[in-house]
Regions:
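Conformationally flexible catalytic loops at phosphate/diphosphate-handling active centers
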Residues: 1-42
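Terminal amphipathic helices with adjacent charged low-complexity linkers/tails
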Residues: 2-18, 129-174
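Glycine-rich, anion-gripping cofactor-binding loops and their flanking helix/strand elements
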Residues: 35-38, 48-145, 253-292, 296-302, ...
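Conserved acidic residues
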Residues: 47, 104-105, 234, 334
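Redox- and metal-dependent alpha/beta enzyme cores, enriched for Fe-S-associated oxidoreductases
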Residues: 51-83, 176-177, 181-182, 223, ...
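Active-site diphosphate/adenylate-binding microenvironment
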Residues: 181-303
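Active-site beta->alpha N-cap acidic-glycine motif
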Residues: 305, 311-313
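A short alpha/beta connector and helix-capping loop motif
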Residues: 319-337
């Protein structure tokens, strides 16, 4: 049987070697205190966690510890979270899905640009939103949205939950989470069934997969590339194409494995320089290792294995980046179009 406390201890033991900040590590590593905090932070609000582009590992850990539904974009680095909800855009856009209308608070990690339902959620006037901003650049300016900006995990937990002594009506956190998990599993099963029918068509199949409105082929392709990256321990770079939305719909969630790192130029350069970005990610495995006896620089390390997933237009827009001279370091790059 699944033991959330045992899982929490195991994850906390691995936190020290992760990319979490010292404050985030302290919040997770002190497992006993974290579990004791949960007795105080009994949810009195129907809170969800949005992990957008660049959100980071802590978004998944935060949602897991507090048993909150997690809406994680493919490039959030939180898609693998135990509470990551597949097909969250579809659930949010479904006017008949009651839990979507019942959301009271949102904790936001990262930069949301991928999903219109997420944008609509963050613009709702009946919802309080908090943005996690532990490290701010010197040029940082808050946006126009009326978000509460918080910099510590403890503040986030206080925002997402409330003291049981002060709450008039408590929310059963497992019940709130399950209200999202079960419908999401049904949509996931439906999606996987459509993919299986596409990949292994029967004689009676009459579905027109050439219809641009039918994204089954794209979802099948994106899911396979994602799973290959997981199995081969490759990093991923995602182009700003329909395929990234196909991946958002078809990529595994609810605790299933994800690639070690997933990058995207969301909200930065569109399709400009996507292949160059993937090359740069791969070349980041090299590092200067001093000089030789002739005072020439020595390079250490090796190219990181990277898979780029993009559409045909994104590929054509930056194909010249593949014109690499043999006098330069070469990437370990696989391009899936």
């Amino acid at each position: 049987d699944y033991d959330p406390q045992a899982e929490g201890r195991a994850r906390a033991a691995r936190a020290e070697g992760s990319g979490l900040s010292s404050a985030e590590q302290r919040w997770l590593l002190d497992s006993l205190e974290a579990q004791a905090d949960l007795a105080e932070f009994t949810p009195a609000h129907r809170t969800v966690v949005v992990a957008a582009d660049g959100a980071g590992e802590f978004a998944a850990e935060f949602a897991r510890v507090l048993n909150l539904p997690l809406f994680a974009e493919p490039s959030s680095e939180a898609r693998h979270g135990a509470t990551s909800i597949p097909h969250y855009p579809q659930l949010l856009a479904d006017g008949s899905f009651a839990p979507a209308a019942q959301i009271e608070r949102v904790v936001l990690f990262g930069h949301p640009t991928l999903s219109r339902p997420i944008t609509a959620l963050l613009e709702r006037e009946d919802i309080q939103c908090a943005f996690y901003a532990p490290r701010r650049a010197s040029w940082y300016e808050p946006g126009a949205r009326s978000f509460v900006e918080l910099s510590t995990p403890h503040e986030l937990a206080e925002f997402a939950c409330a003291s049981s002594a002060a709450a008039d009506e408590l929310v059963d956190e497992l019940s709130w989470l399950e209200q999202w998990v079960e419908p999401a599993r049904e949509l996931q099963d439906e999606c996987l069934g459509a993919i299986a029918a596409y990949e292994h068509p029967g004689a009676e199949s009459s579905v027109d997969y050439t219809d641009y409105r039918n994204r089954t082929a794209g979802r099948s392709y994106a899911r396979r590339v994602w799973q290959d990256a997981v199995a081969q321990r490759r990093l991923m770079v995602l182009g700003s194409s329909n395929l990234v939305r196909d991946l958002d719909a078809a990529a595994p969630a609810l605790g299933e494995s994800a690639p070690a790192r997933v990058f995207a130029n969301r909200g930065l350069a569109g399709i400009d320089g996507t292949i160059a970005t993937a090359i740069g990610v791969s070349l980041s495995g090299y590092y200067p290792a001093g000089v030789d006896e002739n005072s020439r620089p020595v390079i250490g390390g090796a190219a990181l294995p990277v898979t780029l997933l993009c559409g045909d237009l994104t590929f054509q827009h930056d194909v010249s980046s593949l014109n690499l001279p043999n006098t330069e370091l070469l990437p370990e790059l696989r391009v899936e179009v």
